[in-house]
A protein has these predicted regions:
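Selective transmembrane helix interface/packing segments
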Residues: 2-361
């Protein structure tokens, strides 16, 4: 399989040896290139997911979805982006201006930072540390501040109630989310994200397969907790339109609102990407131990495997959103603290026992 690190090594050698640039300029140019790549991927993924959401929603509601602007309505998203870019940005008179303008950037930083840890091909990752799983949970937690500060700084009673709901929900479900990731770390023996994928290469070696029942349960709990962490339906209580107008971002307009809108979809992609990376092998192809089949699967580029698995999980989460009704706040917290949290602890114990006695693939 193609190793993307060859490309990054070539660029580094081009800057340092061929062009003769010093360390500072080389690193600066490389950082700029990485930033451009991240923002470009961020925008493209958000556009694709918004269009996909509209079509999936229409499918489940027996409609066609956007069809007017361009073929199959593919340019509708671009029209909406243009409208959002030119809208006026304003704040209410009694808002805390510093926190009001800071909050959307915190949400973007959290989503982009977490997105940077995803390895979408062999050797293709922006950040890769030996404590990657720990850093993913830490960076993603910054988004809670963005949600809470948006409601608090807006000086709007509906926004404050929404922010309280969103914060308590996100903090609660981070517990189950983290325990499921720890279960994967116990099985693979590493916290490095690229190492987790490498541990899943080989025949029938995806974690959800070799981890047996505990891994399957951890995957399902992770999807539920991740959906709640991203404030997606049926856990979108923080944005309950019939109760709280638009939720914690009621007082935002233009790109202030746009940042929250984009972050929601990137968080959806990040949760799906982490699920596919940790439990479904990430960029690792499906190998079953039959040489001819395995050789054929290995011909498919790693990024196709990664994006294919990720968008399959995205579709599943969209299916859940447009099928189930919104839960109440007491139901959401009861689901986490009375069911998912104890189940996550049991899964972790089961996984530890399986690894200790060698009962895994």
């Amino acid at each position: 399989m193609f190793d993307f690190s060859i490309v990054t090594t070539f660029i580094d050698n081009l800057l340092r040896q061929t062009l003769g640039l010093g360390d500072f300029l080389s690193i600066l140019i490389e950082c700029v290139l990485v930033g451009v790549c991240i923002l470009t991927a961020y925008a493209l993924i958000a556009i694709v997911l918004i269009f996909m959401e509209r079509k999936v929603c229409a499918y489940f509601q027996c409609r066609l979805g956007p069809m007017r602007v361009g073929p199959w309505g593919i340019f509708q998203v671009f029209a909406d982006v243009l409208k959002m870019l030119i809208k006026e940005i304003f704040a209410v008179d009694r808002a805390d201006k510093l926190l009001y303008y800071l909050a959307p950037f915190l949400v973007i930083i959290a989503s982009v930072g977490t997105f940077s840890f995803l390895p979408w091909n062999k050797g293709a990752h922006i950040l890769d540390f030996n404590v990657g799983v720990f850093l993913i949970t830490a960076v993603s937690s910054i988004g809670v501040l963005g949600v809470f500060l948006a409601g608090w700084a807006s000086n709007n009673k509906y926004s404050v109630v929404s922010a309280m709901r969103g914060a308590v929900q996100m903090i609660s479900y981070e517990m189950s989310l983290g325990l499921c990731l720890i279960s994967a770390v116990v099985l693979t023996g590493t916290m490095q994200v690229s190492g987790i994928v490498e541990a899943q290469t080989g025949a029938w070696n995806w974690l959800i397969i070799k981890g047996h029942v505990p891994a399957i349960l951890a995957f399902l709990v992770f999807l539920v907790a991740g959906n709640a962490e991203a404030n997606r339906g049926p856990f979108d209580l923080a944005e309950a339109e019939s109760e709280l107008t638009a939720g914690y971002h009621t007082e935002y307009s233009g790109m202030g609102f746009g940042f929250y809108y984009l972050a929601e979809y990137l968080n959806l992609f990040v949760i799906s990407g982490i699920a596919s990376t940790v439990f479904l092998g990430g960029w690792a192809p499906l190998n079953i131990g039959i040489e001819g089949f395995d050789n054929l699967m290995n011909l498919i580029p790693g990024f196709i495997w990664f994006f294919g698995k990720t968008f399959a999980v995205v579709w599943l989460l969209m299916w859940v959103r447009w099928t189930f009704p919104r839960l109440r706040i007491d139901q959401i917290l009861k689901l986490e603290w009375k069911y998912l949290m104890p189940l996550s602890l049991v899964i972790l114990i089961m996984m530890t026992v399986c690894v200790s006695f060698g009962i895994h693939g």
